[in-house]
């Protein structure tokens, strides 16, 4: 008798995606982040659902409803902090996942890569609208500053901003619609993730060497299921250490002050995972230029397949490209640090230099280095 998992219409899909999926035999722990992102998404949807049961999206009661969750709801504090820190974990995994794709040339799977970039934008949008919901000082002013950036769009900018606000400032209408967006977007992310997987399974996974691995495949279960479980346990350990010992480590103290439109915080900054993009935005003195640089800092990922000049797919055997890649990572970390600093003398110039080098490395130095490496190998 044929196994039910191979014949049943629903179980067949699961089987082909997670059990009998032929996987390369040499994929490293950098390939764990896809499953970790899935776990993060499920965790965020579940904790978010329980938070939504007690949260009220009204300017008068939003802040106190979050306080009520932490003080009065059974285990509300742990749900709230798992959701807040789970978002940080989500982004750490996302950046690792994208970095892996850049390093090993996974961007040559065009559909998978482009849907991944759309996913990144969607997750960033979700995190932004979610950060507004507790209605603290940083929530309010973050929403005001970031939505205001759209006013830099010529001709339609001001109308667009007022349309998003639902009035002439960030107010009740804005909070209500942001809650609606924050509730629906994770389900759109889940649907996009399925499409992402669908396209990935059309081609099969890449591997560290970048060489086709059709001749050496192993079943996903049990080899990679057990490996993913280990990754999940480590992620859970790290998340729970954060939640139970330092829940506010990555948050902003200003968000424990209720939103006050009459009092601007001395230093408005987004969550830690957006600081690199925020630093690029601030490093350009012109408003429209800053907004374009902000969008391009992420959208540049779409150009990666076009900028690939090497005759090898992966960076595994390309030491010069490896050096450039890690310099790029160092620049992103520098930008993250600068984004959290006040706009003062040494930080301004460091931010501008790091921003210029970020674009320079991706657009010029990496393609040129790849060409040089081709010539060194006499290709």
Swiss-Prot record:
Binds 2 heme b groups non-covalently. Heme b b566 binds at residues 97, 196. One of its GO terms (molecular function) is ubiquinol-cytochrome-c reductase activity. InterPro entries: Cyt_b/b6_C, Cyt_b/b6_C_sf, Cyt_b/b6_N, Cytb/b6-like_sf, Cytochrome_b, Cytochrome_b_C_euk/bac, Cytochrome_b_N_euk/bac, Di-haem_cyt_TM. The keyword Transport applies. Pfam families: Cytochrom_B_C (PF00032), Cytochrome_B (PF00033). GO terms for biological process: mitochondrial electron transport, ubiquinol to cytochrome c. A ubiquinone binds at residue 201. It comes from the Eukaryota. Its cofactor is heme b. The chain crosses the membrane at residues 33-53, 77-98, 113-133, 178-198, 226-246, 288-308, 320-340, 347-367. It is a multi-pass membrane protein. PROSITE patterns: CYTB_CTER (PS51003), CYTB_NTER (PS51002). Heme b b562 binds at residues 83, 182. Keywords: Electron transport, Heme, Iron, Membrane, Metal-binding, Mitochondrion, Mitochondrion inner membrane, Respiratory chain, Transmembrane, Transmembrane helix, Transport, Ubiquinone. One of its GO terms (cellular component) is respiratory chain complex III. It is found in: Mitochondrion inner membrane. PANTHER family: CYTOCHROME B. Heme 1 (or BL or b562) is low-potential and absorbs at about 562 nm, and heme 2 (or BH or b566) is high-potential and absorbs at about 566 nm. Belongs to the cytochrome b family. Component of the ubiquinol-cytochrome c reductase complex (complex III or cytochrome b-c1 complex) that is part of the mitochondrial respiratory chain. The b-c1 complex mediates electron transfer from ubiquinol to cytochrome c. Contributes to the generation of a proton gradient across the mitochondrial membrane that is then used for ATP synthesis. The cytochrome bc1 complex contains 11 subunits: 3 respiratory subunits (MT-CYB, CYC1 and UQCRFS1), 2 core proteins (UQCRC1 and UQCRC2) and 6 low-molecular weight proteins (UQCRH/QCR6, UQCRB/QCR7, UQCRQ/QCR8, UQCR10/QCR9, UQCR11/QCR10 and a cleavage product of UQCRFS1). This cytochrome bc1 complex then forms a dimer. This is Cytochrome b. It comes from Odocoileus hemionus (Mule deer). The gene is MT-CYB.
């Amino acid at each position: 008798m044929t196994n039910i998992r191979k014949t049943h219409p629903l179980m067949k899909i699961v089987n082909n995606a997670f059990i009998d999926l032929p996987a390369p035999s040499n994929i490293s722990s950098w390939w764990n982040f896809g499953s970790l992102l899935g776990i993060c998404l499920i965790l965020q949807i579940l904790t978010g659902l329980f938070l939504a049961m007690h949260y009220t999206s009204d300017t008068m009661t939003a802040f106190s409803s979050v306080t009520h969750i932490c003080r009065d709801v059974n285990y509300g504090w742990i749900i709230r902090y798992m959701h807040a820190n789970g978002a940080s974990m989500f982004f750490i995994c996302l950046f690792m996942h994208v970095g892996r794709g850049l390093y090993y040339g996974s961007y040559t799977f065009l559909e998978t890569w482009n849907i991944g970039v759309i996913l990144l934008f969607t997750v960033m949008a979700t995190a932004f609208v979610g950060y507004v919901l507790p209605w603290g000082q940083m929530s309010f002013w973050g929403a005001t500053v970031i939505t205001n950036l759209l006013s830099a769009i010529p001709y339609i900018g001001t109308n667009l901003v007022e349309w998003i606000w639902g009035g002439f400032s960030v107010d009740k209408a804005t909070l209500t619609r942001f809650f609606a967006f924050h509730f629906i977007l994770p389900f759109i992310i889940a649907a996009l993730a399925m499409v992402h997987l669908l396209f990935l399974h059309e081609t099969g996974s890449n591997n560290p060497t970048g060489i086709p691995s059709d001749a050496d495949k192993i079943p996903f279960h049990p080899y990679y299921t057990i490996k993913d479980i280990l990754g999940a346990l480590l992620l859970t350990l790290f998340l729970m250490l954060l939640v139970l010992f330092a829940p506010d480590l990555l948050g902003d103290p200003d968000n424990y002050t209720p939103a006050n439109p009459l009092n601007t915080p001395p230093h408005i900054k987004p969550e830690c995972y957006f600081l690199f993009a925020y630093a690029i935005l601030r490093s350009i003195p012109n408003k429209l230029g800053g907004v374009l640089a902000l969008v391009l800092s992420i959208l540049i990922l779409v150009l990666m397949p076009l900028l690939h000049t090497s005759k090898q797919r992966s960076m595994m055997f390309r030491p010069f490209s490896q050096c450039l890649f890690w310099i790029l990572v160092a620049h992103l970390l520098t930008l993250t640090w600068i984004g959290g600093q006040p706009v003062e003398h040494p930080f301004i110039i460091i931010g501008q230099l790091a921003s210029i080098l970020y674009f320079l490395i991706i657009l010029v130095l990496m393609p040129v280095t790849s060409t040089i490496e081709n010539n060194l190998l006499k290709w």
